[in-house]
Amino acid sequence: MAPELKTEVNIISKVIQGDLESLPPQVREFIESNAKLCQPESIHICDGSEEENKKILDIMVEQGMIKKLSKYENCWLALTNPRDVARIESKTVIITQEQRDTIPIPKTGSSQLGRWMSEEDFEKAFNTRFPGCMQGRTMYVIPFSMGPIGSPLAKIGIELTDSPYVVASMRMMTRMGTAALKALGNGEFVKCLHSVGCPLPLKEPLINNWPCNPELTLIAHLPDRREIISFGSGYGGNSLLGKKCFALRIASRIAKEEGWLAEHMLILGITNPEGEKKYFAAAFPSACGKTNLAMMNPSRPGWKIECVGDDIAWMKFDELGNLRAINPENGFFGVAPGTSIKTNPNAIKTIFKNTIFTNVAETSDGGVYWEGIDEPLPPGVTLTSWKNKDWTPDNGEPCAHPNSRFCTPASQCPIMDPAWESPEGVPIEGIIFGGRRPAGVPLVYEAFNWQHGVFIGAAMRSEATAAAEHKGKIIMHDPFAMRPFFGYNFGKYLAHWLSMAHRPAAKLPRIFHVNWFRKDSQGKFLWPGYGENSRVLEWMFNRIQGKASAKSTAIGYIPADTALNLKGLEDINLTELFNISKEFWEKEVEEIKQYFEGQVNADLPYEIERELLALEMRIKQL
């Protein structure tokens, strides 16, 4: 007979899988107190097995939450409520006693570097949402490891959720189940609580059989208590709490305390024709090609690129002073639109088995489709859009949601690095920052030193497709590509990065900035991008080896005249690609100054202020 969990309100939650008695006391207490609060009908402790996964998928099919894609092996399609399609920054908060622990106090207006909520306001919000929120549903207990199980850099979390979609996705995105629980023992874990906020019986029918509660959505982080509490959204970024919530917001705070870095960065290995290998980490804002770079097929003969991770890096200096990085994830949660054989052949080779697609279009022959897939539809095959309606190009709107996703196991990617799961991590020798800058910013430049490199990360800006009320594109500040993900005050984060230079024996990686997106006066890209970006990586590789020459400019080192290998490329206008215009950079300096003064204000480290002044002086002398 399954053990029953008695609660004060006499709601009984049956344990339908697993054994509460055998769990570590602090895990059991976490489950019991939340079961008492949320009142699920049953409790399922996940073991991560293949058999369990089949059961979870069957439950979702039965609920109409996913459907099988007959064209591929073990692939599924979920269509969400159109109001639950992305991360929601306005509803993502961090709770600390003091506002300044979370964000710098801006000079005027509100902070763009995070959202703080007071403990009192959070308590009220929590109490209006969670009591009874899982009635009629199963509470799944998901023990998971961020990072290879047993790695000294890994951390354990436990997520309680009432969404089977979260269970199936977390099984791909993390190392989930019994092994994670064993690794935890009686240790510390990050407590993650998630509910879609739709107790049964429903008050109103679901849209697309997708439970969510957009009015009451809230994603809250309590770094002092190592807790994440998410309500009302089933979408990945808000519900797969190991991803941005834990691996960036909570982890960046843990990293500050423990002396390491948790960053929004891909990790790749690059090997030259002589068989020498180096690892790079790279931070780009969303939609600037992180996944494409991490999985690139280099155009340069004899060069090889392998992928360690496409989104998040945890990096710590070892005893020898090497900066060691792990990918804390176990899968890819990638944006589907724009993914094609041309833009990312290795992603295409990864995603057509054991994958959950969300909000892409479906073909009448049981396949998937999206903008930029670059595959003509076979004759007679029709499309159903992500809104579950018949679709033709005349509809005037995209067939797949612009933020539609694939969730797929990393182990299926044909170019995973042999060391991608190595417990000690891979040694990072170069860090790359980048953004989408149509004007003014050269293809590549190198920082003069670590401090200058930290300044470059802090000053990152990138073109964003603005919300509907703006016409055209705007250039947004996105420092370190972490703007939506800082777990604590950005000024203190900069100080933490700067402090790495004072570590005894630290071998500091070189820092670079790239811009694949510069355009000419006709609006055409000046650089072909994709596999040709390997030429830029080749220059960086050779710089680290002390082999490639560079010339010093006002903004950093750029490749000397013949240092960038352009063999086999036609019509590359190097002059325009590397032009550093005084007028442009004067405006850029002014923009950065306003941003630092307005947003980071009193918390801006003086070293960063000094770097800005030095840049201003160098620009004046152009």
Swiss-Prot record:
GTP binds at A287, C288, G289, K290, T291, N292, R405, R436, Y530, G531, E532, N533. Pathway: Carbohydrate biosynthesis; gluconeogenesis. It catalyses: oxaloacetate + GTP = phosphoenolpyruvate + GDP + CO2; L-seryl-[protein] + GTP = O-phospho-L-seryl-[protein] + GDP + H(+). Binds 1 Mn(2+) ion per subunit. Pfam families: PEPCK_GTP, PEPCK_N. Residues 457-487 are annotated as: Omega-loop. Phosphorylation at Ser-90 reduces the binding affinity to oxaloacetate and promotes the protein kinase activity. Gene3D superfamilies: 3.90.228.20, Phosphoenolpyruvate Carboxykinase, domain 1, Phosphoenolpyruvate Carboxykinase, domain 2. SUPFAM superfamilies: PEP carboxykinase N-terminal domain, PEP carboxykinase-like. GO terms for cellular component: cytosol; endoplasmic reticulum; mitochondrion. Its main location: cytoplasm. Regulates cataplerosis and anaplerosis, the processes that control the levels of metabolic intermediates in the citric acid cycle. At low glucose levels, it catalyzes the cataplerotic conversion of oxaloacetate (OAA) to phosphoenolpyruvate (PEP), the rate-limiting step in the metabolic pathway that produces glucose from lactate and other precursors derived from the citric acid cycle. At high glucose levels, it catalyzes the anaplerotic conversion of phosphoenolpyruvate to oxaloacetate. In eukaryotes there are two isozymes: a cytoplasmic one and a mitochondrial one. This is Phosphoenolpyruvate carboxykinase, cytosolic [GTP]. It comes from Gallus gallus.
